[in-house]
């Protein structure tokens, strides 16, 4: 099960048995290959039971440059064996499902506070050290309201002791660090890095002649240096982790940022399995202890964190199949079919659907030509997805948010499988698809678009 996630860019020659790559190392990268799986699917985990008798599975999954994450799956027992998946779709995990039935009332919230102004008595739980830290060489109290890192000798960033990190959060995010480098001594360097193998960084280096801005990309082994007249800068990393790329930039006022260097490639590697991490660092390249760097703040912005608008509840939408760009259409023969984009059918009310909220992620889709609610009949074969005048339990779908570009899937609660088409045959929609491929081009992934006009007044239908 890949949940529709491709294997991204991959480092082939950095693994557990390989040394830590030094500057100038050659990295052998491989790009995405359609629906090739590799080690992306759910793997390595276990199962747990709840007091009410439900079972759930947890497992790892490699989400491109975000790294290895944890997935939760409903578990079904059959013939004495546990299967990830629902009774009607063993072996496949829905991307969205009702949460485990636990006694506690838990409101939705972010698991971590990622931004830190370093004003508290301790580091926030989201932070992790890249190496065992030297306790006497970092402080939150020497300069109240700042994280102070004293520089220790290191030949390069990957060996720096007091580097503090947190996971880069996807699908996209921006990390901004406010660095006061006044306390750096010659040979010191401090800044913000994308911790990976290869890594990339942007920061301030103190030379015998003064301060310079230094940008480095280990993949290309390219360095960019610019003289600085100030010792305080804002450093920024903007990452698109679905596409394995990032951009580094800097600012002297915290408002106007200037990109430095080109686009950074963020591959996944099997040395740490962690993908890309944001890191604050300070070390000395001359083989001695040096000065200090003060990080005044660290802020993470997640423009896609609010998913509430990704399910168009109460809205009228069109649905387009991601595989072949055909428009989902309830045809006059009473079945869900496809219409060519721009055609009379695609522009008509039979290709408009009102999304009704039925709670817990469930929706009912009302066809705006007055023919009824999309309902799965029979066993969900081709032409078994039909508009019926009366809504029933067989009209319920679990909306699957695919996180990007208004992509979604519809899981029938009757068959516990997805609606879809075979893009090569032109057959009507069915509700017997087990899931999608990593490239999402198998006919099960849809793209919704809100429409401004309903074309005809919605009719009162029996429920």
Cite the ranges covered by each PLM segment.
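Lectin-like carbohydrate-binding module/patch detector with strong preference for beta-trefoil
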Residues: 308-463
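Carbohydrate-active catalytic/glycan-binding domains of CAZyme proteins
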Residues: 1-313, 350-352, 394-396
């Amino acid at each position: 099960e890949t949940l529709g996630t491709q294997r991204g860019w991959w480092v082939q020659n950095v693994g557990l048995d390989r040394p830590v790559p030094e500057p100038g190392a050659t990295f052998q990268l491989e790009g995405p290959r359609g629906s090739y799986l590799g080690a992306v699917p759910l793997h390595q985990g276990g199962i747990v039971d709840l007091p009410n008798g439900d079972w759930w599975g947890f497992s790892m999954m490699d989400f491109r440059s975000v790294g290895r994450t944890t997935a939760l799956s409903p578990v079904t027992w059959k013939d004495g064996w546990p299967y990830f998946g629902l009774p009607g779709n063993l072996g496949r995990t829905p991307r969205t499902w009702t949460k485990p039935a636990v006694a506690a009332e838990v409101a939705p919230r972010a698991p971590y506070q990622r931004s830190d102004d370093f004003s508290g008595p301790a580091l926030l739980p989201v932070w992790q050290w890249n190496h065992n830290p030297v306790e006497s060489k970092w402080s939150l109290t020497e300069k109240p309201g700042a994280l102070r890192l004293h520089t220790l000798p290191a030949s390069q960033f990957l060996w720096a002791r007091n580097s503090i990190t947190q996971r880069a959060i996807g699908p996209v995010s921006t990390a901004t660090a406010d660095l006061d480098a006044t306390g750096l001594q010659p040979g010191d360097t401090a800044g913000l890095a994308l911790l990976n193998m290869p890594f990339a960084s942007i920061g301030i280096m103190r030379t015998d002649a003064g301060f310079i801005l230094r940008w480095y990309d280990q993949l290309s082994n390219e360095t960019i240096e610019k003289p600085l007249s100030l010792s305080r800068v804002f450093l920024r990393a903007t990452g698109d982790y679905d596409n394995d790329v990032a951009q580094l930039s800097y600012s002297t006022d915290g408002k106007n940022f200037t990109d430095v260097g080109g686009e950074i490639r963020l591959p996944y590697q099997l040395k740490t399995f962690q993908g890309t991490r944001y890191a604050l660092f300070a070390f000395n390249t001359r083989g001695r202890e040096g000065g200090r760097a003060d990080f005044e703040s660290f802020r993470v912005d997640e423009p896609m964190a609010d998913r509430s608008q990704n399910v168009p509840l109460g809205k009228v939408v069109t649905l387009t199949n991601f595989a072949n760009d055909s428009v989902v259409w309830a045809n006059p023969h009473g079945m869900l079919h496809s219409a060519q984009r721009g055609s009379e059918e695609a522009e008509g009310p039979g290709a408009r659907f009102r999304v009704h909220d039925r709670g817990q992620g469930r929706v009912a889709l009302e066809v705006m030509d007055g023919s009824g609610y999309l309902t799965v009949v029979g066993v969900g074969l081709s032409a078994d997805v039909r508009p019926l005048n009366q809504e029933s339990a067989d009209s319920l779908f679990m909306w699957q948010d695919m996180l990007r570009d208004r992509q979604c899937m519809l899981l029938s609660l009757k068959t516990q499988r997805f609606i879809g088409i075979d893009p090569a045959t032109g057959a009507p929609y069915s509700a017997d698809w087990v899931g999608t491929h990593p490239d999402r081009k198998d006919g099960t992934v849809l793209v919704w678009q809100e429409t401004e006009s309903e074309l005809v007044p919605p009719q009162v239908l029996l429920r």
